[in-house]
Amino acid sequence: IVMLKNPIKSIYSRYYVFRNEGLESSSFEDVIKMEMERIKIGDERNELRVNNPDFDDRVNFNYLRHCNYAEKLKTWLKEFKKEQILILTNDEFNADIDKTLKQTFEFLDLPNYTIKNKYKHNVGKYPKMQESTKKLLVDYFRPHNQELYKLIGKELDWDK
């Protein structure tokens, strides 16, 4: 079961988790610019490659590559048939928890079950992202998202 979250929302949330844990002190904008620079030189330096077995995406504060879902899904599709993977989105889940849970139970061939306590835990509140940074991220993720949409057979509204 795969639960996808809009990559921009995901990295913004992840940034604030790291910041609140005292692991990140730079501004979000600086963090994104620095990672984009690391990605540019990553092919030249093995320690910055995600496929390096020594790469630890938490230690390396890897925000952008962490959300390249198409890359990860392609790996899983080499091991599993597409019908063996249920792909959900965080937006669908938040819009209709009961429907998403029913879909999940059906996929797992389990009887439907009503969950009583469906409130959200650990909900973070963050300042609004700068528009220039959001545009930079939309542009960065667009080709990755387009590849994902082809793999899952549907378009999501993440490229806005």
Which residues make up each language-model segment?
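Active-site glycine-rich loop that binds ribose-phosphate moieties when present
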Residues: 71
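Short C-terminal domain-edge/linker segments immediately following a structured domain
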Residues: 4-6, 31-36, 116-120
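Short aromatic-enriched loop/helix-cap "lid" or pocket-rim segments at secondary-structure transitions
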Residues: 11-16, 22-23, 98-101
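Charged, low-complexity, helix-prone segments enriched in Lys/Glu/Asp/Gln
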Residues: 10-18, 34-35, 134, 138-145
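The conserved 3'-phosphoadenosine-5'-phosphosulfate
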Residues: 64, 74-147, 153-160
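PAPS-dependent sulfation machinery
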Residues: 16-61
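Acceptor-substrate binding/catalytic loop of class I
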Residues: 60-68
